[in-house]
């Protein structure tokens, strides 16, 4: 048992229980955290060292922009946990150290997901991949991407090309796995290795395929922990043992996360739920007089600074889907325990306070687990920081706690999972709007004219009949669900085989829950289109080949986003219906089906891939992001828009329901105190309506227009998009225009 070793002084002053005999971080937190219900008066400003380091980061960021988005990159060394020497911003000033290569801002080369992707990322920025490295990963070491395309069917390839399924993680790391990085700080690496060895030695001796695979995975996990210790040694730390103070706890935890991002470039490399855990160490050191509040904030600021400069080399195609260089270093803050105690600590404030000390930023993806039972002072502080920075997203803890307990985190944007006990197979999105066009055209693509879906006679009537359209739409969704799940099964089989997340999984229990995280795009377009067909008169317009390529609408129809049950119920039905169809298909590793209504910035790409739709949206125009109403159609004010989105049922969308909400400051009130109060009331109301997620932007449209014209004046302008935050000036002009075209609510 761990308590018999020589490191018990690391836990001096902590309340003990099961956690000091077996891995149980949740119990450690519940026994030892200190609820804070006070205000923000205790917070400290940035130290001189913090300001100096942040100036250095801003200078490097400026140089990166001037170099076309890439400061430097490795073109020869495949990144692993131990591949590069230690790197620093300023070793004498940094309180938390460690970067992905030997230099900050130098991006690593990660070929295990796909050598073609790695090569394309190099060439996109004027670099050349080392020929010997390319040869190794082409001729001798197969990659995830190669494996997937070896197994894809022609039907899957056609769907991918047409964009009825797109954004699939078949050419990039899947991500969305959260290692329990807290375990390294609490237990030290040696104990974690002992536990993995114990699990390996007590496994079934009946060598089925599942057992053999798990034995190999455990061996890889064990080796990754050895590498993690070596990484610690490179920076002068012995992380084989538990952390003994707050500074070590932050450093140990960060090194574990650093190891993960050195080894994987997943689309979302989320951090978990660390602030309350780390606060336990801070409170102990403060009580003992070993540290000051200013020193605690400085360490947090330096930790946040490191999370802000996480970088991966991406291809232009990837950047179209996930624009603005996001990494989704998502940190989940707050929430309420299953015993009813809020889990807000002083560290909850300190993490958000970094937005003052360092200025606004998109990373880490600061996510407040909102509950109506959070302390009022914390609610007000969150509202104040949202209005000031537009850098925070909110997710309904009262909704998620029922399914995930009180030690879950958010992966990527809106996907809840129990930390260290659950992972997901990320599945991008199926295009429900395009599927509706396939139903009308008998499986033919409205843009290319090719037969992509199942072949049957297209609709021939001069006016679309709702019942006829829906009957065919249902069949098309049946087909789409099948090809979608089967594509994901191939992708995740190959990812486990060729690009396994061994370190992240080493920081999980050996027996875990897996989910198959599907998603849908174009929900509001599909719902409004069906509403138009049902309540107005929609005439299809055909080209010379008889393909429906446009629509003429006579009359008005209910539009999603106005709290009108006639169309909102269509949206709800689509979500429930498609989820039922997905569940009818077997998943890889018996993972549980989940679904998201989330698009990231790929709503622009989906729009490009989709022709004219029966709701009046023109070919190529962006979809609304996530579960949002289409731009400008939610005309009855903020609360009606929120009410429509809140109707989407979380029970069949447990991978998350993203809602991005923009409001002008004056609509929240004239005075700051009124604005803060009104925003907290709005969040409480949305939570009570069972709304899941809310990105909040508070600014005027004119600010964004000026930033487009004068980007140099807005280096830290941060906005929330579908599920994450981004530096506005890093978006493409097309995506900037899409953001500006969205609804800015001027009334509640």
Swiss-Prot record:
Subunit structure and binding partners: Homodimer.
Disulfide bonds listed in the record: none
GO cellular component: cytosol
Subcellular location: Cytoplasm
Pathway linked to the protein: Fermentation; pyruvate fermentation; formate from pyruvate: step 1/1
Additional comment: Several mechanisms have been proposed based on complexes formed with substrate analogs. After activation by the glycine radical, the cysteine radical, Cys-413, can abstract hydrogen atoms from the other active site cysteine, Cys-412, and from coenzyme A, and it can also transfer hydrogen atoms to product radicals. The other active site cysteine can attack the central carbonyl of pyruvate and covalently bind the product acetyl group.
PANTHER family assigned to the protein according to its UniProt record, in alphabetical order: FORMATE ACETYLTRANSFERASE (PTHR30191), FORMATE ACETYLTRANSFERASE 1 (PTHR30191:SF0)
Source organism, top-level taxon: Bacteria
Keyword check for Cytoplasm: yes
UniProt protein name: Formate acetyltransferase
Catalytic residue positions: 412 (s-acetylcysteine intermediate), 413 (cysteine radical intermediate)
Family: Belongs to the glycyl radical enzyme (GRE) family. PFL subfamily.
EC annotation from Swiss-Prot or TrEMBL: 2.3.1.54
Keyword Glycosyltransferase assigned: no
Annotated function: Catalyzes the conversion of pyruvate to formate and acetyl-CoA.
Keywords on record: Acyltransferase, Carbohydrate metabolism, Cytoplasm, Glucose metabolism, Organic radical, Transferase
Any Pfam family the entry gives: Gly_radical
């Amino acid at each position: 048992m761990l308590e018999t070793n020589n490191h018990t002084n690391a836990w001096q002053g902590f309340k003990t229980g099961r956690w000091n005999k077996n891995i149980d971080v949740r119990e450690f937190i519940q026994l030892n955290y200190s609820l804070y219900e006070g205000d923000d008066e205790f917070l400290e400003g940035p130290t001189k060292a913090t300001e100096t380091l942040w100036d250095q980061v801003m200078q490097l960021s400026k140089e990166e922009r001037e170099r076309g988005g890439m400061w430097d990159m490795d073109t020869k060394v495949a990144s692993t946990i131990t591949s590069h020497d230690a790197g620093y911003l300023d070793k004498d000033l940094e309180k938390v150290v460690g970067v992905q290569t030997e230099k900050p801002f130098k991006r690593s080369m990660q070929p295990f997901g796909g050598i073609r992707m790695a090569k394309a990322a190099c060439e996109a920025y004027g670099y050349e991949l080392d020929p010997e490295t390319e040869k190794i990963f082409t001729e001798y070491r197969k990659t995830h991407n190669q494996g997937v395309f070896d197994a894809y069917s022609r039907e899957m390839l056609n769907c991918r090309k047409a964009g009825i399924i797109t954004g699939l993680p078949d050419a990039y790391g899947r991500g969305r796995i959260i290692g329990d990085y807290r375990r390294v700080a609490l237990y030290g690496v040696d104990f974690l290795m002992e536990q993995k060895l114990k699990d390996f030695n007590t496994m079934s001796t009946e060598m089925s395929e599942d057992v053999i695979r798990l034995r190999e995975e455990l061996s890889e996990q064990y080796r990754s922990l050895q590498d993690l210790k070596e990484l610690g040694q490179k920076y002068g730390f012995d992380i084989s043992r538990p952390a003994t103070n707050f500074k070590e706890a932050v450093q140990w935890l960060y090194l574990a996360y650093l190891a993960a991002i050195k080894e994987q470039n997943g689309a979302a490399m989320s951090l978990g739920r660390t602030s309350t855990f780390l606060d336990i160490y801070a409170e102990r050191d403060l009580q003992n007089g070993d540290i000051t509040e200013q020193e605690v904030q400085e360490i947090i600021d330096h930790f946040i600074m490191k999370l802000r400069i996480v970088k991966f080399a991406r291809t232009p195609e990837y950047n179209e889907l996930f624009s603005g260089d996001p990494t989704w270093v998502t940190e989940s803050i707050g929430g309420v325990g299953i015993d009813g105690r809020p889990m807000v600590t002083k560290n909850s404030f300190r993490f958000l306070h970094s937005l003052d000390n360092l200025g606004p930023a998109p990373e880490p993806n600061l996510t407040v687990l909102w509950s109506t039972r959070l302390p009022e002072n914390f609610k007000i502080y969150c509202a104040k920081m949202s209005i000031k920075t537009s850098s925070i997203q909110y997710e309904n803890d009262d909704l998620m706690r029922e399914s995930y307990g009180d030690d879950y985190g958010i992966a990527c944007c809106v996907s809840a999972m129990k930390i260290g006990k659950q992972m997901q197979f990320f599945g991008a999105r199926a295009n429900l709007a395009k599927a509706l066009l396939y139903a009308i055209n008998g499986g033919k693509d409205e843009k290319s004219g090719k037969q992509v879906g199942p072949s049957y006679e297209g609709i021939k009537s001069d006016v679309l009949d709702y019942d006829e359209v829906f009957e065919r739409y249902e069949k098309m969704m049946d087909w789409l669900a099948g090809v979608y799940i089967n594509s994901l099964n191939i992708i995740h089989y190959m990812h486990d085989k060729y690009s396994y997340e061994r370190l992240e999984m080493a920081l999980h229990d050996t027996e875990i829950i897996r989910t198959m995280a599907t998603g849908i795009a174009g929900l509001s377009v599909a719902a409004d289109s069906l509403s138009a067909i049902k309540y107005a008169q929609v005439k299809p317009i055909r080209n010379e080949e008889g393909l429906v390529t446009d629509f003429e609408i006579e009359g008005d129809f209910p539009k999603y986003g106005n709290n009108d049950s006639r169309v909102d119920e269509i949206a709800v039905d689509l979500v429930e219906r498609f989820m039922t169809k997905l569940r009818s298909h077997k998943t890889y590793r018996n993972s549980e089906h989940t679904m998201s209504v989330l698009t990231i910035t790929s709503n622009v790409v989906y729009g490009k891939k989709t022709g004219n739709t029966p709701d009046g949206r023109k070919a190529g125009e962006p979809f609304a992001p996530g579960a949002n109403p289409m731009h400008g159609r939610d005309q009855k004010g903020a609360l009606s828009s929120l009410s429509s989105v809140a109707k989407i049922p979380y029970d069949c969308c447990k991978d998350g329901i993203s809602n991005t909400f923009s409001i002008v400051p004056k609509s929240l009130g004239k005075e700051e105190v009124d604005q803060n109060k009104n925003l907290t009331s709005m969040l409480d109301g949305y939570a009570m309506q069972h709304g899941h997620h809310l990105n909040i932007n508070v600014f005027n449209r004119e600010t964004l227009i000026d930033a487009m014209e004068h980007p140099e004046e807005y280096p830290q302008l941060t906005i929330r998009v579908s599920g994450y935050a981004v530096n506005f000036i890093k978006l493409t002009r097309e995506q900037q225009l899409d953001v500006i075209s969205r609804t800015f609510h001027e009334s509640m």
